[in-house]
Amino acid sequence: MSQTLSFVLKTHSVRKDFVHSVKLTLARRRDLQYIYNKLSRTIRAEACPSCASYDVCPNCTSGDVPDDGSSTMSIPSWEDVTKSSTYSLLLSEDTSDELCPEDLVNVAAHIRKALSTQSHPANAEMCKEQLTFLLVMAEAMLPQRSRASIPLHQQHTAARLEWREKFFSKPLDFLLERVGVSKDILQTTAIWKIILEKACYCKSYGEQWFTAAKQKLREMKNFESDTLKPLIGGFIDGLRFLTVDNPNPMGFLPKLIGLVKPLNLAMIIDNHENTISGWIITLTAIMELYNITECTIDIITSVITAFYDKIGKATKFYSCVKALFTGFRSEDVANSFWYMAAAILCYLITGLIPNNGRFSKIKACLAGATTLVSGIVATQKLAAMFATWNSESIVNELSARTVALSELNNPTTTSDTDSVERLLELAKILHEEIKIHTLNPIMQSYNPILRNLMSTLDGVITSCNKRKAIARKRQVPVCYILTGPPGCGKTTAAQALAKKLSDQEPSVINLDVDHHDTYTGNEVCIIDEFDSSDKVDYANFVIGMVNSAPMVLNCDMLENKGKLFTSKYIIMTSNSETPVKPSSKRAGAFYRRVTIIDVTNPFVESHKRARPGTSVPRSCYKKNFSHLSLAKRGAECWCKEYVLDPKGLQHQSMKAPPPTFLNIDSLAQTMKQDFLLKNMAFEAEDGCAEHRYGFVCQQEEVETVRRLLNAVRARMNATFTVCVGPETSHSIGCTAHVLTPNETFNGKKFVVSRCNEASLSALEGNCVKSALGVCMSDKDLTHLCHFIKGKIVNDSVRLDELPANQHVVTVNSVFDLAWAVRRHLTLAGQFQAIRAAYDVLTVPDKIPAMLRHWMDETSFSDDHVVTQFVTPGGIVILESCGGARIWALGRNVIRAGGVTATPTGGCVRLMGLSAPTMPWSEIFRELFSLLGRIWSSVKVSALVLTALGMYASRFRPKSEAKGKTKLKIGTYRGRGVALTDDEYDEWREHNASRKLDLSVEDFLMLRHRAALGADDNDAVKFRSWWNSRTKMANDYEDVTVIGKGGVKHEKIRTNTLKAVDRGYDVSFAEESGPGTKFHKNAIGSVTDVCGEHKGYCIHMGHGVYASVAHVVKGDSFFLGERIFDLKTNGEFCCFRSTKILPSAAPFFSGKPTRDPWGSPVATEWKPKMYTTTSGKILGCFATTSTETHPGDCGLPYIDDNGRVTGLHTGSGGPKTPSAKLVVPYVHIDMKTKSVTAQKYDVTKPDISYKGLICKQLDEIRIIPKGTRLHVSPAHTEDYQECSHQPASLGSGDPRCPKSLTAIVVDSLKPYCENVEGPPHDVLHRVQKMLIDHLSGFVPMNISSETSMLSAFHKLNHDTSCGPYLGGRKKDHMANGEPDKQLLDLLSAKWKLATQGIALPHEYTIGLKDELRPVEKVSEGKRRMIWGCDVGVATVCAAAFKGVSDAITANHQYGPIQVGINMDSPSVEALFQRIKSAAKVFAVDYSKWDSTQSPRVSAASIDILRYFSDRSPIVDSASNTLKSPPVAIFNGVAVKVSSGLPSGMPLTSVINSLNHCLYVGCAILQSLEAKAIPVTWNLFSTFDIMTYGDDGVYMFPIMYASISDQIFGNLSSYGLKPTRVDKSVGAIEPIDPDSVVFLKRTITRTPQGIRGLLDRSSIIRQFYYIKGENSDDWKSPPKHIDPTSRGQQLWNACLYASQHGLEFFNKVYRLAERAVEYEELHFEPPTYASALDHYNSQFNGVEARSDQIDSSGMTALHCDVFEV
């Protein structure tokens, strides 16, 4: 059975070894038995539930299957089913028997039991997928009404409905791609149903669905194996020619050399340059060499034209490649060579890599392939099996399409006529596709299945035709009634009349029977004695027949349901002269539709009168029916004498006209004429027909024009048909109409200006337009003469019909045929041309059939081309122009020569009289045609001359100085300019440092202009370079020289006199090492037993080191101690040592950006196996500019955040020093127990929490609720007048019902988005500029704090302890020192930090309790509080607090204003800086914290580290702050990917450094976008003031002119710059006399320069008080501290005094009311007193405990102020 399994049993099987179904507890005891079961039954997909309890399951070997009650009949055994012919046909055996539906049901029943019980014998060879294919196959082959009996049909239908609901809304491209890669037959069927359903309703969904469905139905998802055959055959023929037919190489080599031209080719290649011009020159030379220039240009033009049509399909290639490897699983194979050979053979034949089920079959065939002979035999067996797999996939796909299309044949699915018509067209396309496959010799074994599929589609087509006919108007038949006495010969006359009307046998209807299944639908229908029964309503039946509305006949058989009456002629007989009484209600309708013929036989009547009672002799009847008298009544004559009264009153009042006598022949003619008249209709043609041409002339010239057009048709062998008048006759091409001016015509019109008989002679000169005197384009003329409708294949040939050949091609190879056919085709049709060429050569006796199929799929160009092919199988003539005609014969037909060019325009020019009648489109077409003709004549020469010019300009070498001027000292370039040694050095250094190529003259002129003070760009840059160079002018040293002349004291220069180059113009990608190594404190040397250096290792922490395997191989030592606990994963390894380095480096799985020496890294970071001197190593290829040496292995490659992502393990050596091999970091569990608490556990699975990807925690810390802000007792009634209110309190707050958790989640989502920031090289350059700028006032090597408690006391103790300890820091302190719980946490973190190990970077999340604008409260916007771990904060304070203090100490003059007191004279220094600027921009940013790029923050942290002492504490703090922060709330931990937490240590300084870096990057990019190279320090040319996201930029005119580009670059980095007042609009320069910075307006007042606090911030101090935590903020607090409240309001009055008397009086009244209602014990100051107190504090005369000493301290309860 296994050798005869069909495609449904072979395709998509999934191997699951039997041993996998056995429980692990029994594995050791039954190994031998399971091995036997594995070898004997390898294709089992699933084991039954009882298999685990038996060595050999009895259920799986039983041949009989008991009925489980699901079937209504007895089921034969599986053995009997396998012997049936239906099962044999399913297995593709060669038999001619038809499939039996009953056998199909039996097979399907067994399949259902096999799927349900899983102990069926079929399970030994079939998996679930194969059984499902069998059931779908049964569905496709059975009629739709019989499918309900198939088991699992309902389940499959439900599954398809679910797939339909899932995919119905998907776009067309998604469905087409999915149907190409899906391996689920149910899913494929559902997708096909969606595509076909939307194609049927394309009016609603778009025409592209119908077009795509038609195209996709003609495509098959298979690999065309025949394409390999001609290629392999050509190789064999070539090999035979070289070795057997022509073994003498002397005869072949000269031809080969002459063809290849190796010398010329070698010279071309030697002169090739890898540049654009070099490639153009080389390719042009090669095309010239092989004479393919013209055709190559044409091909390139065609490719460019079709590029945008093809680019949309490019993704299909990736999908196809990916589908080959989807689901592939490794197998435990023994004979690897034969498995590889079998897999390759399977791919070449089927186009698919074998999946696991097929791989099992391959293993069965190759089980004994242990020798070469047995392997070859097994491969031959496999080839036969593989050959069927390609066809099986085709039949599977056709089955799915058939099921999908047949399910659409449902009135509930396709309801309207348009959808039925499209369904009919799609069914015909699929039917034709299946029919084509039945003609394929390879598919012959599957013909029974294909015929059943065609039968199903025939049913769909028939049903659609019936549904169309029911809904459409039909032709009205003609009904004649032959009335007369019995025996006169009416019935015989009716039969004879039927033969004269049609060649078909007439249909017969008997109205005495109520079912009409015998009606055949032929053209003539006879109803004998139609009025013989009174029980039949024959009047209405006749009215229904003779009608334009469709008539559905009542049929009993199911297959005849919906049958329509379709006959053209109805002949009825009756013995009654009046079949319907005139008084009947239906008499008028009846007689209007019928014509009555009164039939009499005079011979019979006379015989009966003469001899009554005797039979009528045969002599009374004649064969020509001349014995009958046929009298045709007039219209609506109900009897011979009278006509129906129109009013229906007196039917005997109107006499009938005399009858018309006819014979049988004239009666037939009369009936035919009546049918034509009844169904005559006139339909107007809309629009302008594309293939209709009208030639307008006068009436007397019509005949002459007609003769001229016929002459043109004969001269050109044209395909058009000449018609006189607008009516069209049949034509294979266009139609040419001769018209008069008054005739209407829908087509292109041309006015004939010259028409005479003499014009016929002009046709000999091919001047068609001159002879006709019309002005038409050459394209229209070619289209008229040679256009062909559709594709026509002619098996018979008439020489007078053959066109004149333009090309004659003798086909000696496939390439000759393909090269010639390309002229006829568009670019899309060239692939079909090559395929057809293969078929013509391989099977020449089937040329017509194959060419018909090919031509139906091919699109031809609009150019007229005729080619005669002389092939081994005969002659093929192909003519194309829009469509194509082809003649294919098995004998020779010689028809060479003829027209070699298209018809030309003759002597008519656009300046003639016909030009005004020519439309503009034709005039421009004529122009473009002329330009194209000119280009075609010069295109080759133009390309060659262009390439020649490039080649000539390539070799223009500059003369090199010789002799005394070799070093270019002296005369240069023949200008007579001589330089001194110093001038020469200066000129060389200037060109080298600024990357210029100035001549001596230009250099001297530039130096002269710079000395004179010129202000142009070049002079300014030269002066900058000169000033930098002169800084080293005094770099001398006093030395004592002892020589022949004695002892001399001289000064010698210790350094070369050159400008100091800071490298500002060197980009990140251009930098080269070696430089300082990263993580210097964490890198150690690995040595051998003798102490010789082998490589490096990197400390990961806790005595664990990372290195590469070949470094630590053998006896390896670290710091004199042997390493231990070595573990490897590929080339990456880890080990332990008791020697611990002072610092540790963080590791991360990612792509590196820097090598160990600081140079940039270019890599794809895709691990592959590489062969090295140490063996094969799995690593990643990278390129850097640093040259490495032996012993560098193990050094770290880092990313932007300083994390180690790989280790150096090899290089390309001296030949390719830039090539590096890097081993990526992989996690190795060293089983170290964590010594510190950490919430975020990477080993836990990710979960989704309200849209955030996070880790679940063991404990839940909820977000604090309520607020401490309350309305003042003085404003319980009017608090709504204040612009601010306490922030939203959560879900119970009526102002905004948004929960606190939702607010936190919405605030965290921007932090989870990636923010790239500025480019790498730009950020790196600006970072160097900022470091140099800060170096002027920040000292180097600032020592870090070595005492943990000293660092702790530098922190603000009113803040949170972080996620590991609840409460604030001061809550865990006693007598000014931390308690045991806090001290233990600090000690654990400090111990790790002293080893340089990064700490967990985790924060607890809360919401800030503050006043917010009312509109933001209603939106639920609150600012988050990131509670930093107290241990991390202590370590960072120890590391960077000294650097931070040094930066903030210069806030008055530096770019960072952190630490400034805006109520001190410092504000005057800011005002002077602002006033000195040319343009001032005040900028604020929206959502600053969440839009920070991690790379920019890492660069700012590196700046702090640059000025530190680089101790392990600094390394730990730096690595901690660079790692991604983790936000902890509500029992989850979220690792964010961007942003800067507001609670990060030193957040104000880091934010301000970020601000400076962003602005510097934006300016740098804007300048260089204007082609201005930046070689100076930007921060020395403009001033900037930053405090976090607040900024004031003082730009010079140069920078202000590109401010739009600067702010545009800032936006491109992910920032959101806005105006300070948050108004909408571009950021523009502001008035320097009133600048807003830190919510202060810096302006001049009568008291001097002051920073005025925002008025709303002052006023809202009186409306709200801080008290106990509560949800009722509208009620005043229970307890008010009069001291702190009085101090708050006192300070508010002082700030109000700076705004003038009017505003102060308003505040004074509020203060008085507050004192009254709040029962305070202080007197508000007067205006003069407040002014005096504030000025005293400002100038430092009077000091107060609540004075704002720095912006980081609180005053005036600034948690209420929005500062």
UniProtKB/Swiss-Prot annotation:
Q: Which UniProt keywords apply?
A: ATP-binding, Covalent protein-RNA linkage, Eukaryotic host gene expression shutoff by virus, Eukaryotic host translation shutoff by virus, Host endoplasmic reticulum, Host gene expression shutoff by virus, Host membrane, Host-virus interaction, Hydrolase, Membrane, Nucleotide-binding, Nucleotidyltransferase, Phosphoprotein, Protease, RNA-directed RNA polymerase, Thiol protease, Transferase, Viral RNA replication
**Which parts of the sequence carry Phosphoserine?**
S1067
- A GO CC annotation given for this chain: host cell endoplasmic reticulum membrane
Q: Where is this region: Acidic?
A: 981-986
For this entry, list what GO says about its biological process: DNA-templated transcription; proteolysis; symbiont-mediated suppression of host gene expression; viral RNA genome replication
The protein's organism comes out as Feline calicivirus (strain F9) (FCV)
The active site is formed by H1110 (for 3clpro activity), E1131 (for 3clpro activity), C1193 (for 3clpro activity)
Q: What is the name of the protein in this document?
A: Genome polyprotein
Where are the Phosphothreonine residues found in this chain? T1040
Q: Where does ATP bind?
A: G484, P485, P486, G487, C488, G489, K490, T491
Record domain SF3 helicase: where: 458-614
Instruction: Tell me where on the tree of life, at the top rank, the source sits.
Output: Viruses
- Which one of the record's GO molecular function terms can you name? cysteine-type endopeptidase activity
Q: Which residues form the RdRp catalytic domain?
A: 1478-1603
